[in-house]
Amino acid sequence: MPGFLIAFEGLDQSGKQTQAEALNETLTAAGRACQLLSFPDYQTAIGTEIRRALHGEREYGADVMQLLYVANRYETRKRIEGWLAEGRVILCDRYTASSIAYGEAQELDPGWLADVQRFLPAADLTILLDIPPDVAVQRKQANRDRYERDLDLLTRVRGSYQRQAADPRWLQLRGDRPKADVSADVRAAVASRLGLL
């Protein structure tokens, strides 16, 4: 059985982790081996540096921050490739499109951001859980990092995600609906596009 990589993208509080976990339960119950990932991975040295920057302990330009995010994903590249070779379904809470969305929102070239990630395994399906920026801010009032406090930035990030979602390997869903409704749409897409259910 081939492996698949499914990425969940969207603003913070859009339901990415919730939907990745729900799909993991469904696929596991159907007999598929799965692997849940979340980026950034704060358990690595690069992830620790990202956390410091997000909480204001370090100051980096937008280009350096995106390179840190990309490097954090490259830290996991060999494991991802191994899991895919084993036939696992990898479910990512954020993946390569996040760097493009947040970088483009900060006036970085999206082509450059895609190019530096070209050696990472490509997602077979990217699911955009789209919510308005004001909903994202309302859902997370406490402990927001520097990106989550900037409504204008979140609006630009959302625009980049929506442009990327024109790719046929993407599915855009409204993330402000009941969780069960979103989960049903995710399962239907995984069944029809990847034949997993």
Where in this protein do the model-derived segments appear?
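Hydrophobic residues at beta-strand termini and immediately following loops
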Residues: 37, 129, 173
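Short beta->alpha linker loops
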Residues: 41, 71, 95, 131-132, ...
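ATP-dependent small-molecule kinase phosphotransfer cores
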Residues: 32-118
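NTP-dependent small-molecule kinase module
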Residues: 24-26, 134-197
